[in-house]
């Protein structure tokens, strides 16, 4: 791996970050706060939140078994994705490599930041070859993006191939584990210390059921986290989000119950889809969704819209011709979907 300084944009490495009032004083002893030009009325919402989310990171570290210094929190995982481009990629000069198909925001952030985005097509089984991915990289490749379980395909990428990429690549490997809670494959979090060039992304939007609060997590070396904290907006995670996330962590048993139920419902839906005559293939999934190839994705999608049921038409995505992506819902929602599909002509 190149040194962190070699990977970081020179201007970012030299950057002196903005220091907010709450950065300069974060103690608990004071009772009068006249430092941040806040309105003294409308407690507690008149106060700026902790810019480093210390209480939340402490609670999160207990669940994830990762020290707070190795945790970055952002306004959704998309903030972390955008920040790694801004921190490590020189616009108009550097490039990144990613599997295809995968989560679309990697390319959007690359385009926004004027960074070349190189795609390597997955195999027909939606797996990838580390050698093929590495062959596309060159001396200007700063990052490789992997998503496992992958979106929209739903499958876990082969762990051996992921490890090979991490070990053999000189730059940063961003591993998006947004759907890992629904997989039987263990997270790479327990191996974070082994891989100084690894950044793991997770989210509160899926298993935690908190998409509305917009909270994403990045786990990495203390040095990488320091770079991300240097360039983030001062109060990027609001106080209401921090409070709600802490509440969810205090009832983690509930999240585990949801995950168990959703995995059972995924099996129910997959079995039901296999029986539908116009379903050509149901792809194995380790996420809270699955991909199904049908005879006419556009026609079936439009039919479901007419029935008040929305799935995702992935027909235009690489390797996903005539495919629908179906999110696992409650038993009542899933039964309504299957009932509507059984009536489809």
From Swiss-Prot:
What is this protein identified as? Answer: Histidinol-phosphate aminotransferase
GO terms for MF: histidinol-phosphate transaminase activity; pyridoxal phosphate binding
**InterPro entries in the record, alphabetically?**
Aminotrans_II_pyridoxalP_BS, Aminotransferase_I/II_large, HisP_aminotrans, PyrdxlP-dep_Trfase, PyrdxlP-dep_Trfase_major, PyrdxlP-dep_Trfase_small
Q: What is its EC number?
A: 2.6.1.9
Q: Whose protein is this, by species?
A: Bacteroides fragilis (strain YCH46)
Query: Which family is this protein grouped under?
Result: Belongs to the class-II pyridoxal-phosphate-dependent aminotransferase family. Histidinol-phosphate aminotransferase subfamily.
Gene Ontology annotations of biological process type: L-histidine biosynthetic process
Top enzyme class of this protein? transferase
Task: Kindly give the PANTHER family that the UniProt entry links to this protein.
Answer: HISTIDINOL-PHOSPHATE AMINOTRANSFERASE, HISTIDINOL-PHOSPHATE AMINOTRANSFERASE-RELATED
Pathway participation: Amino-acid biosynthesis; L-histidine biosynthesis; L-histidine from 5-phospho-alpha-D-ribose 1-diphosphate: step 7/9
Please give the cofactor(s) recorded in the UniProt entry for this protein: pyridoxal 5'-phosphate
Catalytic activity field: L-histidinol phosphate + 2-oxoglutarate = 3-(imidazol-4-yl)-2-oxopropyl phosphate + L-glutamate
Q: What is its quaternary makeup? A: Homodimer.
Q: Which UniProt keywords apply?
A: Amino-acid biosynthesis, Aminotransferase, Histidine biosynthesis, Pyridoxal phosphate, Transferase
Gene3D superfamilies, from UniProt?
A: Aspartate Aminotransferase, domain 1, Type I PLP-dependent aspartate aminotransferase-like (Major domain)
Which Pfam family is an annotated match for this chain, by its short name?
Aminotran_1_2
Residue numbers carrying N6-(pyridoxal phosphate)lysine: 206
């Amino acid at each position: 791996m190149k040194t962190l300084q070699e990977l970081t944009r020179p201007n970012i490495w030299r950057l002196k970050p903005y220091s907010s009032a709450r950065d300069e004083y974060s103690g608990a002893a004071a009772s009068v706060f006249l430092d941040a030009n806040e309105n003294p009325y409308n407690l507690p919402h008149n106060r700026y939140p902790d810019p480093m989310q210390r209480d939340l990171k402490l609670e999160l570290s207990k669940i994830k078994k990762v020290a707070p210094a190795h945790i970055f929190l952002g306004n959704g995982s998309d903030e972390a994705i955008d920040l790694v481009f801004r921190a490590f990629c020189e616009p108009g000069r550097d490039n990144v490599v990613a599997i295809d198909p995968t989560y679309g925001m990697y390319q959007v952030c690359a385009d926004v930041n004027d960074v070349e985005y190189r795609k390597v097509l997955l195999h027909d089984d939606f797996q990838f070859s580390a050698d093929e991915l590495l062959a596309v990289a060159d001396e200007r490749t700063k990052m490789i993006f992997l998503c496992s379980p992958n979106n929209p395909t739903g499958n876990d990428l082969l762990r051996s191939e992921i490890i090979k990429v991490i070990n053999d690549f000189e730059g940063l490997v961003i591993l998006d584990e947004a759907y890992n809670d629904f997989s039987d494959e263990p997270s790479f979090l327990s191996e974070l210390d082994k891989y100084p060039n690894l950044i793991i992304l997770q989210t509160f939007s899926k298993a935690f059921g908190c998409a509305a609060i917009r909270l994403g997590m990045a786990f990495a070396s203390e040095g990488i986290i320091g770079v991300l904290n240097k360039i983030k907006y001062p109060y990027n995670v609001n106080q209401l989000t921090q409070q709600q996330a802490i509440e969810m962590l205090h009832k983690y048993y509930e999240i585990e119950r949801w995950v168990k139920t959703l995995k059972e419902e995924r099996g129910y839906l997959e079995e039901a889809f296999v029986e539908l005559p116009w379903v050509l293939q149901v792809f194995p999934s380790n996420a809270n969704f699955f991909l199904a190839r049908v005879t006419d994705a556009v026609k079936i999608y439009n039919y479901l819209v007419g029935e008040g049921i929305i799935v995702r038409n992935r027909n235009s995505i690489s390797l996903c011709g005539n495919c629908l992506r179906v999110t696992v819902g409650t038993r009542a929602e899933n039964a309504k979907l299957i009932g509507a599909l059984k009536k489809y002509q």
